[in-house]
Amino acid sequence: PPYSIVWVYPKGTKSQIKSRIRELDALGVEGISFQGELQVDTISILGKGYAGIVVLGKMGRKKVAVKIRRNDSPRKNLEKEAVLLKIINKHKIGPKLIASSKNFLVMEYLDGEKVGDWVDGLKKNGNSSQLKLIIKKVLEDCYSLDRIGLDHGELSNLSKHVIVGKKTTIIDFESSSMDRKVSNVTSATQAFCIGSRISKIIGRVYKIPKKQKMITVLRRYKHEGTRESFENLLAVLKL
């Protein structure tokens, strides 16, 4: 069947496909529906990274996001990502992990749009107070991640890694690590405010401080990592 590629993307055997379908059944996922803005072959999906692809699933009456490990992934399983998700979920960050196995993560489905698209929609007369709330929420979550020593790893390309909706949160923790220096707050602040595509749009909606001032407060935060130096950053950003 044409959809079978999804289970073993980019390619795999019939027995691998059968085994993965059984594995997903065992997690309690009752159905998959192929929709979303991305495509593999001609199949619509929610997301695609180098470790997995994400599709929409159903558990009872609940929509879920199902991450399927890519067959060509250097990772032998998704267990490390599941462990990290459990840790950040305790701090109310990320999509809630519902179930996991070797090749699957079942997470709450977050209805919303990627922050890059959301910012695009603001145009010139966007709502600056709403924008500030979103930036503050993301930076607060980044501060929490810094405190627990978990580095997201991809926040310099923020546009794709935050969902804005009823629940605004950071997503895609497949490159995360607790074994390297954290730079969540600095990466996200730079993405929002310094020289990225979205920073140009944000700059039209509300006045971002001068680059040199930003670099100074970020340096202080990087050096101290304290709540006070973080509050100082928020104050400079007028958040």
Give the residues covered by each predicted segment.
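Juxta-kinase regulatory segment immediately upstream of eukaryotic protein kinase catalytic domains
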Residues: 1-43, 233-238
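ATP-binding glycine-rich loop module of kinase domains
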Residues: 28-80, 86
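Active-site beta-strand termini and strand-to-loop segments that position acidic
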Residues: 56-60, 108-109, 164-166
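A conserved alpha-helical element in kinase catalytic cores
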Residues: 67-101, 133, 192, 196
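Conserved structural core of kinase catalytic domains
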Residues: 93-135
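Protein kinase catalytic-loop region centered on the HRD/HxD motif
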Residues: 140-151
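C-lobe/activation-segment region of protein kinase-like
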Residues: 150-154, 165-239
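Hydrophobic residue at the +6 position relative to the catalytic HRD Asp in the kinase catalytic loop
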Residues: 158-164
